[in-house]
Amino acid sequence: MVFCTYCGQSFTRDEHLERHILTHTNVKPFKCFTCHMSFARRDLLQRHYTVHGRDQNQNEIPAVNGMIPKSAGRTPIACSNCAKTKTKCDKKFPCSRCAGRNLRCTLRPTRRASKNANRVGATLESATDVPTEVTTVNVEATSKDTRAQENSSSPSSQKSGTPISIGPIMEETPDIAPPQPFTEQVNGGPTPPEFSPDLQESFMDHNLMSGFPGLTNPSKDSSDDGSSPRFLLDWSQMQMPLGYDNMIQSDLMLDPELSFDPNSVPLAPHADGILSIMPELANGGMESLITPFETPKMSRSFVELGLGNSNPAFHSHRHQSMPSVQSIPNSGNEMPAMIAAQDGWSAFRCTPTLPSSSCPKTAKLNLEQLEETLRNHEGWVSWSPRWEDNDLAGGGDHLTVMQLHESTRDKLLAIMQSFLHKALETHREGRGTSNGSHSPNPSGASNFVLLPPGRVLEYFLRSYSNSFERYFPLTSRSTLDANELMHCYNDRAASILVLLMIAQGAANIPSPEARMLTGGLTEACRISLFDLIERNIIMSGDPIVLHSALLFTVQAAWSGDKWQMDIAMGQRGMYFAMLRHSGVLDRSSHAASAQPQRTLEQLWTDWIQNESRSRLIYSWVMVDQDLALFHDTAPLFSVTEFGAPMPDADRLWHAKSAEQWSSTFERVHEFSSGFSSVGSGARPLSLRDLFRHFLDDDLIPMGIEMTPLQLRLLLHPLQSMVCQFSQLLSCFAPATYRTSISVHPNQAQPSSRNISQSSTRTRLAEVQALLQRWFDLAERYLKANPLCALMQTNLILFHLISLNAVTNFPEIERLARRENVDGTYHQLLWLHKRCIPDVEEAVFHCGQIFRLVRSMPRGVRPPWWAGAIYRVALILWTDSLTHKDALTSTSPQGNGMFPSPIAGPSFAIDALPPDHALIVRYLTKREGVPCVTKLDGSQMGLERAYPVLRHCVEVIDEGCSTRFSDAIRGKLERLSRG
């Protein structure tokens, strides 16, 4: 017995192992000389030649070539007589030995008798006993539900109907007459057969095989151990050349032992149009169509159309997406479960909450919908996005995305199938079959899944590069090459990474098909990533694994799926611990130049390796900051942990050659006295050292030039300090409300508690001064450099952190949920003061967040941008509650309990820069009436709650629609309705 070194599967014969190893190595040594398709086995190549009608020597293959169709996707085995005598059988029918001895040649079933008990045996008679007949089939118009019922029950006799002759249906016989030639057209192609409309409709819409028992009693797969995905185990899963797989109805491919006769198989709707471009089909020469597991080849003229270019052929279908309701069954079951679980979110809770036990589970639903959409091959071929290039790229692609090789897509497909199989097994525990194998799909569709076409995958990778890579720049040389990832690293780890890239890119596409792909891939990769780490703990420190974990955490945290969001928050601590234990957070101790004779290419390669490590480390810091900010918790990382150098300038990271990197390095790290900095090992400061210089206000005197990424990382410790002091202040109740409800107010005396509250406010004011120092550094950078997406994100985060210093957002959400609110006047005063201690400062930061978010292209915004609008909406809504009461319960003279509005000019708080005179006057003298700008350019006041929330909903509608943004929009709409 021999074993596979890749997967450990055992084999009894060496040739079986040799053939199995080809499935791991992806080596296909046999190539067709006509269409240049590659094959892993010689017999598959010989079978493929029958499609062309010529062999490798360009000799015509006779119609009677002795080959019989495969059964259940297997090569035919010896007949019963040869098997009993253990003699070699040529596998013809009848075989030469039986014909020579005048024996009855009987084909054996390809499955064991124990597993074939419920299957209808297919015993073929000898050639002399099977005449060629021309049959007439009665076709009756039935609905889809009736056909589905017939497929799941025993066959019944059809009612009498008008017989429609559809041409000769040839039974299997060793003597098959050659097809009649068609009249040649001018272009050299055969003329397709003509069908009348009525005949064609009946021919396409009815199941001609309903009388076969094998179709109504599909058996289970023969896999015992479940080591291979079920998608690769039955006849219907063998891939066909492009165009063939959509022509055969899926309900005819349920029985693996049903022999394939193309002349008796009804074609799927719209398949007749394909006949004119497939001479083999038009001529009936389809004796053996099954091809090895190979990506369908696509003409370059179609690929070069691209997605998102200015080609008129593309723009004619720009706003057409594949019909998800018709082509993807049960697509409407996705959103109700997602929406029902939104009230159970652990963050963004402005509506009454639900316990997690009451929320519907969505993991299994995501996987099943992924399986359904991957079966919809025709839908993905015709899929196109609904928006323009400017929305996707934001003025230009961030990275160059290399075209996917065919071998890369094949490898990715095979591994993805195993991921999906494992994930489905995980979530179907207790519902599977007794022997661990899968039964056919209940809907009657084929179990054969395919990744979307290469052009669609490249489009998703392009979307990923323009959205994710702008904020987490982890790809060097300005080039994203999935082929290199798949062939230069661990297969499973690299596949998880590439699939998560595709899922991340698809998440930004406003398409139901893309959402289904994203949700299922994220869940499948999560399970496989966790399994990969469990099986080999050494992989926990692998950069590819940590990169994949980063992608999963970001994608799941902002997915809009309650369960994926919770898992991301729960598992981030595990991934943070993996990062700590790998030792990469500490500064490297090896010598900077151990080999003085290194070439420029070697220096560049070493620098890229070190820079990749730094960027991966500090990308986790940014993820920690984002999750902590929007969940109102303290970051898990401490600034003192980071001794590794920070990422260097993006100009160096995006250099495409060693010479370009060398010249840029000389300018970025310029040494005095004319010495070359290349090869010196010069690296930026660590975050710990940079923050120390920032506290000492030494960055400008020391001439330290900051990059947008370094400015972003500098906000992490500032956010930690704001969170710490804000949480401490929330433990103190405002004196006004305490005094108003105190029984003995005169007994209130200074105490250690008051001293602690005062000192905490002083410390918080110091942090606000540090935030202003950071803002000065950012403005200094913007005076010398153009505004980029990362810098816009930095400014949004700055205003969000500043909002946390002047508001109590958890209390605002409690007020929105009406928790412990009795509606009294004194409580409203107390709640407003407790939620927003500094109204003018809070309104200013809210307006700036509006301005920055709306100035960003909708397709390249950070994944949490809708969460920023959510926080702004609730703060302005809370402040408008007091304005509303002031308008209804005070006198025109303003002598009521609420102060009268401050006099001054009205101004758009979301359209003016921070240094504008009106904003400065509003912040310093508290003069002016802030407004927001509507879509039509008019200004709207902030005095009424409902218009404020509606305006925030409109701002969300301006951006890209995702599951997360749609959920935030729904929450704000529910709040506006009260």
UniProtKB/Swiss-Prot annotation:
Pfam families: Zn_clus. Residues 152-165 have a biased composition (Low complexity). PANTHER family: TRANSCRIPTION FACTOR WITH C2H2 AND ZN(2)-CYS(6) DNA BINDING DOMAIN (EUROFUNG), TRANSCRIPTION FACTOR WITH C2H2 AND ZN(2)-CYS(6) DNA BINDING DOMAIN (EUROFUNG)-RELATED-RELATED. This is Transcription factor MYCGRDRAFT_87993. CDD domains: fungal_TF_MHR, GAL4. GO terms for molecular function: DNA binding; DNA-binding transcription factor activity, RNA polymerase II-specific; zinc ion binding. Residues 113-231, 426-445 are annotated as: Disordered. It is found in: Nucleus. Signal peptide: none annotated. Residues 79-105 bind DNA. A zinc finger (C2H2-type) spans 2-24, 30-52. Residues 432-445 have a biased composition (Polar residues).
